[in-house]
């Protein structure tokens, strides 16, 4: 069926303001788990950490912090509150993100230099084709809104721009996908989703749609990251792309009669 509606994630799918966030989150978790006195090596801990981070990517950040707290507890440690872990993580990634946003606001760099290559052309083409667009992110709503405005892409998302309202919100990408189907905006097979995490794949596959995995090797986003590719395929991705420069070829598959 011809696509009538598309979901886009933000970080690593559209914007690169927080490129490198996973390295920072892994480092934070390694430090917390080492402090428990565990005999596990970094090489043994890293896959455990990366697994829960990827599984929860696209969902509210607090869930990854709750998973960290549980892993500390399992090793006999006394974890910080998940909200404190989140505060520490946001402080670390915020230093990088704030500098990139400053470059945008002051005109030092064009918005495209902090976006996945080809993003704007895809958004323009999908709107031209009459596809309704939603941007849905696990990042806090206020931050998402500021960034999409800075990129000058808010206008493309006629379905709306959504971030996580609060840590205790029940809002989810899967829930929104089910809602648009229930409202008659599109049938499940008429929905496509672009994302670099498990949540985007799960949400669209749950309603029978098509999932496009952004296995971008950040920050250049010129080639496929094998680690992301493997996990996105396992999560249900129908297509894997490193960026949107292959859009014309992908479009032939998505819009084939």
What are the residue ranges of the model-derived segments?
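Active-site neighborhood of HAD-like aspartate-dependent phosphohydrolases
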Residues: 1-47
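Substrate-recognition element of Asp-dependent hydrolases with the DxDx(T/V) motif
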Residues: 25, 108-114, 119-149, 160-166
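A metal-dependent, Asp-based hydrolase signature
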Residues: 51-113, 117-128, 132
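A short, structured active-site edge motif that brings together acidic residues
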Residues: 83-86, 153-170
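Short acidic-hydrophobic, aromatic-tinged amphipathic segments that line or gate anion-handling sites
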Residues: 162, 238-246
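Conserved Lys-Pro-Asp/Glu-containing loop-to-beta segment of HAD-superfamily phosphomonoesterases
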Residues: 171-204
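Acidic, Mg2+-coordinating phosphoryl-transfer loop and its flanking beta/alpha structural elements
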Residues: 193-239
